[in-house]
């Protein structure tokens, strides 16, 4: 008997020794088969996964870990990146404890064979973006030990899997950033082990999930961002006593903030921004003793900031901007010892800022702009020398800027526009090492600017409309990167320092409406970066520098209303970039030069110069004391009269001959073509005219024809042929294009290179965009090639171009014809806003202007524009919202939805037709079917912005600056999860 048992044991030992290597080899086979379906960017990925005769060689493969029996227990190939699909053979790695395939580019559905991975504790397939289909809940049933399930940022759809409630050990669950629909299953409230719940941006809807309050171990909960709940913040959440992060931003919450949240003693982050919350901020929130970040911005909250906030001793960030809050900002805010960011712009706060604000020494950013605040600026804002951004614009602050701010070396941006501030500006403000912009326009500052100034990064100074006096200090020349200098409407006197025009990057200078004397420095002739110069309404004397024509890129020169003498330099005629010239009301004399750029300017450019001789005058005025070429007697001598009569008869004969020849020459050029350049061009007008051939036409429209022209220097240009001035018709946008594109420069606005013109025809010359218009690509046969990454980038870049027009141009510029066909794409698919034929300057940014007729394109026109003809920048915002919907849906704004229905109405109709509407459900219903592998979170984010832009009420639409901010700043919790 004993011998039989011994033989049996030996047999089992032999079988074990025989088959153990075999099992290890099987895992190697599985890995090598998996490798064949995981393709790297340059062919096969996982280069060290190579077959070997060694039974445990696979255990040294990158991303692979084994147990003592050489069985694979961990497979982590995240951030490789890999393409391809997840092979069903993954289910053969039955000893896997950790499967992490995050941050790759896997596509397709999850294989059901994964249900064999019964030992799995970690399953992380996040940030692939292209995993699709319904999430197969059945694979989870046997994963009884699963602790982490992360599917964030993929394309899963359908309902959330109800099987989650069976995972009794699950601690981390993220289904965020997918295309799910419907409600959160109530059974999710039974996953008692759960510590992290991420359902943000998942397209969920239904009632606000109060049942999640049963998750007593929960520490982080992200359930906002493009989910759409009915109801408000569940009061029951006050029972989640271990909760550290509650993020319900942007999920259509209504009602008031529940006071029960004050029970969350461990909560350090509360994000409820971008909702429709009403009522007051509960004073009970001061019970959140661990709170560090509070964001309640962009809601409809009213009332005052609670005094009890003094108890929030750990808070670092308070964002309350864009609400309806009022009253005084309490002293308690200044008492908060760790406060770093305080943003309350666009509210109705009154009275003074807390005098103790910043005294804690930690303040980094303060933005209280667009309120009704008054009083003095607190002196301790930068006590800790950490303050970086100080924005106090559009209030009623008075008194001086505290001297202490002049010592704040951490400051990077100072914007204190439109207040009642007075006194002298601290000298130190102009010597701060990190400041990039100083904007003090529209106040009552007085005194002289400091004699000593310096700063390596300062690029913008705006001191317009104050009471500054004294001389302009030469020390301004110590700002090597200065680009913009606005000193207009002050009381400066003395000369313009030559050092200013020696700055290597100066592009715009305005010293108009001062008491400046002396001459224009000769150094202006060497300032090649200048684009705009306004020295008007001063007492500048002397002559115009002869070398002014060396400033090749100068587009605007206004030196009117001075005491300039001498003749106009003929070299100005060679300044092909110069589109605006104003020399009026000086003491210039001699003849206005003929030809060149002088053909562009009209008589108003030279008005008010008594002794200046305009080209059409036969005789020129002379100064008192000067003698004419002939005395009075000679003028009326008999011989003179005879000669005059003969000349008159001869002239009549010549005129009659000319009239008879007119019809013969009607089809010939009425004037020689003239090229006017806005930058240095290496071709001539003849080169442009050679390209006006039928085979070069690339587009036709109501304003004319567009040709592609190949210049001798191998540069392609786009030539837009307009109906000209001589036909009696309108100029079809010629003036608007010249006045706008001729004076602005921006990366995302198409460059106007110049124009060629004669009496009958205008030819506008643009940089050529080889990829055509967004409209052509989006709605043509190539639309499918515009994947989401490109579409999103185009949206951001076009928004930046429009933002520049609305917020960085003075006066602001309205485009008035924003549409996909007017967004052009260069060889890198970079977007450029184009076609300014309907553009309009709006002098007062807060006003609107009434137009005589509707401008714009059907399907893009804002509703208020159609029936009031009043236009402001929000009209452009509406049109841009339509473009965003085009990018999402891939459909034209009109013509595809039935009579009288445009894309905006179609989207709203679609929402009404969905049984359980949510942002995700709407996006799924309208998204361009040609898009593949698009990230749900990003598309919904853009969709939300689009719907804000196309609000019926203009006041409800965001500004383009806000649009750019939203497009370029994904929700905070989403951004953090992406970096997982």
From Swiss-Prot:
Disruption phenotype: Ectopic fruit organ initiation after floral meristem termination. Enhanced disease resistance response to the bacterial pathogen Ralstonia solanacearum and to the biotrophic oomycete pathogen Hyaloperonospora arabidopsidis. CDD domains: STK_BAK1_like (cd14664). The modification Phosphotyrosine is found at residues 766, 804, 860, 867. InterPro entries: Kinase-like_dom_sf, Leu-rich_rpt, Leu-rich_rpt_typical-subtyp, LRR_dom_sf, LRR_N_plant-typ, Plant_LRR-RLKs, Prot_kinase_dom, Ser/Thr_kinase_AS. LRR repeats lie at residues 93-119, 121-142, 143-167, 168-193, 215-239, 240-264, 265-288, 289-312, 314-336, 337-360, 361-384, 386-408, 409-432, 434-455, 456-479, 480-503, 505-527, 528-551, 552-575, 577-600. It catalyses: L-seryl-[protein] + ATP = O-phospho-L-seryl-[protein] + ADP + H(+); L-threonyl-[protein] + ATP = O-phospho-L-threonyl-[protein] + ADP + H(+). It is a single-pass type I membrane protein. The modification Phosphoserine is found at residue 852. Residues 660-980 are cytoplasmic. Gene3D superfamilies: Phosphorylase Kinase, domain 1, Ribonuclease Inhibitor, Transferase(Phosphotransferase) domain 1. It holds the Pfam family LRR_1. Its EC number is 2.7.11.1. Self-interacts. Interacts with CRN; this interaction is direct. Interacts with CLV3 and CLE2 mature peptides (MCLV3 and CLE2p, respectively) via its extracellular leucine-rich repeat region. PANTHER family: LRR RECEPTOR-LIKE SERINE/THREONINE-PROTEIN KINASE-RELATED, RECEPTOR PROTEIN KINASE CLAVATA1. Involved in the detection of CLV3 and CLV3-like (CLE) peptides, that act as extracellular signals regulating meristem maintenance. Acts with CLV3p as a ligand-receptor pair in a signal transduction pathway coordinating growth between adjacent meristematic regions and controlling the balance between meristem cell proliferation and differentiation. This is Receptor protein kinase CLAVATA1. It comes from Arabidopsis thaliana. The gene is CLV1.
């Amino acid at each position: 008997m004993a011998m039989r048992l011994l033989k049996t044991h030996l047999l089992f030992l032999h079988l074990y020794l025989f088959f153990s290597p075999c099992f290890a080899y099987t895992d190697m086979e599985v890995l090598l088969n998996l490798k064949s379906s995981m393709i790297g960017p340059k062919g096969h990925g996982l280069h060290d996964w190579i077959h070997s005769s060694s039974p445990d060689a696979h255990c040294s493969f990158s991303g692979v870990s084994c147990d003592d029996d050489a069985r694979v227990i961990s497979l982590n190939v995240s951030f490789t990146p890999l393409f391809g699909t997840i092979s069903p053979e993954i289910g053969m790695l039955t000893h896997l404890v950790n499967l992490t395939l995050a941050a790759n580019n896997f596509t397709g559905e999850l294989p059901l064979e994964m249900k064999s991975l019964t030992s799995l504790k970690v399953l992380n397939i996040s940030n692939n973006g292209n995993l699709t289909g319904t999430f197969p809940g059945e694979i989870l049933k046997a994963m009884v030990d699963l602790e982490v399930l992360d599917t964030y940022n993929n394309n899963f759809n359908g309902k959330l899997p109800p099987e989650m409630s069976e995972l009794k050990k699950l601690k981390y669950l993220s289904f965020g950033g997918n295309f799910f629909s419907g409600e959160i299953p109530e059974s999710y409230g039974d996953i008692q082990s759960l510590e992290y719940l991420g359902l943000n941006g998942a397209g969920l809807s239904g009632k606000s999930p109060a049942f999640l309050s049963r998750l007593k171990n929960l520490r982080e909960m992200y359930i906002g961002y493009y989910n759409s709940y009915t109801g408000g913040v569940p009061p029951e959440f006050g029972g989640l006593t271990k909760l550290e992060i509650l993020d319900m931003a942007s999920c259509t919450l209504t009602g008031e903030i529940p006071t029960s949240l004050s029970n969350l003693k461990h909560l350090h982050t509360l994000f409820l921004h971008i909702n429709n919350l009403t009522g007051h901020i509960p004073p009970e929130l001061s019970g959140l003793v661990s709170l560090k970040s509070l964001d309640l911005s962009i809601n409809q909250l009213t009332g005052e900031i609670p005094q009890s906030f003094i108890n929030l001793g750990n808070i670092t960030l308070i964002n309350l901007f864009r609400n309806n809050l009022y009253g005084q900002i309490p002293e308690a805010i200044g008492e908060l010892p760790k406060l770093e960011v305080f943003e309350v712009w666009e509210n109705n706060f009154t009275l003074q800022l807390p005098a103790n604000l910043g005294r804690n020494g930690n303040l980094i950013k303060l933005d209280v702009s667009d309120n009704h605040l008054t009083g003095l600026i607190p002196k301790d804002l930068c006590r800790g020398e950490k303050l970086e951004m100080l924005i106090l614009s559009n209030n009623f602050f008075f008194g001086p800027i505290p001297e202490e701010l002049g010592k704040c070396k951490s400051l990077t941006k100072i914007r204190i526009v439109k207040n009642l501030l007075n006194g002298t500006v601290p000298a130190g403000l102009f010597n701060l090492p990190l400041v990039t912009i100083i904007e003090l326009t529209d106040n009552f500052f007085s005194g002289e600017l400091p004699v000593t100034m310096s700063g390596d990064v300062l690029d913008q100074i705006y001191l317009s409309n104050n009471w500054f006096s004294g001389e302009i200090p030469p020390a301004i020349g110590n700002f090597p990167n200065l680009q913009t200098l606005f000193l207009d409407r002050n009381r400066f006197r003395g000369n313009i320092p030559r050092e200013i025009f020696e700055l290597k990057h100066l592009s715009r200078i305005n010293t108009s409406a001062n008491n400046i004397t002396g001459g224009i420095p000769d150094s202006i002739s060497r300032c090649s970066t200048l684009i705009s110069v306004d020295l008007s309404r001063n007492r500048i004397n002397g002559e115009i520098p002869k070398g002014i024509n060396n400033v090749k890129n100068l587009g605007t020169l206004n030196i009117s209303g001075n005491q300039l003498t001498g003749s106009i330099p003929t070299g100005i005629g060679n300044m092909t970039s110069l589109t605006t010239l104003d020399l009026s009301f000086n003491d210039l004399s001699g003849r206005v030069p003929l030809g060149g750029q002088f053909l562009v300017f009209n008589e108003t450019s030279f008005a008010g110069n008594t002794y200046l001789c305009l080209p059409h005058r036969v005789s020129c005025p002379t100064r008192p004391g000067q003698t004419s070429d002939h005395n009075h007697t000679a003028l009326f001598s008999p011989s003179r009269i005879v000669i005059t009569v003969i000349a008159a008869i001869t002239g009549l004969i010549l005129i009659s001959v000319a009239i008879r020849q007119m019809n013969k020459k009607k089809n010939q050029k009425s004037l020689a073509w003239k090229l006017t350049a806005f930058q240095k061009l290496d071709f001539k007008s003849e080169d442009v005219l050679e390209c006006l051939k039928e085979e070069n036409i690339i587009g036709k429209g109501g304003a004319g024809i567009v040709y592609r022209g190949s210049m001798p220097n191998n540069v392609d240009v786009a030539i837009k042929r307009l109906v000209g001035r001589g036909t009696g018709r309108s100029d079809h946008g010629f003036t608007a294009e010249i006045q706008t594109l001729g004076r602005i420069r921006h990366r995302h606005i198409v460059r106007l290179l110049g124009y060629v013109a004669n009496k009958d025809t205008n030819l506008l010359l643009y940089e050529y965009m080889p990829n055509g218009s967004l409209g052509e690509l989006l709605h043509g046969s190539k639309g499918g090639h515009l994947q989401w990454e490109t579409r999103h980038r185009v949206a951001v870049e076009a928004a930046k171009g429009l933002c520049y027009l609305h917020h960085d141009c003075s006066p602001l510029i309205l485009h008035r014809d924003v549409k996909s066909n007017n967004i052009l794409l260069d060889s890198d698919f970079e977007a450029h806003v184009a076609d300014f034929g309907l553009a309009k300057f709006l002098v007062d940014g807060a006003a609107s202007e009434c137009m005589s007729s509707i401008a714009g394109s059907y399907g893009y026109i804002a509703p208020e524009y159609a029936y009031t003809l009043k236009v402001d920048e929000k009209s452009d915002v509406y049109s841009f919202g339509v473009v965003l919907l085009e990018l999402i849906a891939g459909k034209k704004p009109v013509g595809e939805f039935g009579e009288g229905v445009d894309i905006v109405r179609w989207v709203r109709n679609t929402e009404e037709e969905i049984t359980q509407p949510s942002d995700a459900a709407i996006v799924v219903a309208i998204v361009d079917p040609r898009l593949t592998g698009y990230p749900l979170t990003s598309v919904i984010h853009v969709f939300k912005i689009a719907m804000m832009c196309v609000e019926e009420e203009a006041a409800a639409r965001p500004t383009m600056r806000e649009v750019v901010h939203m497009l370029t700043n994904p929700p905070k919790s989403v951004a953090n999860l992406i970096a997982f």
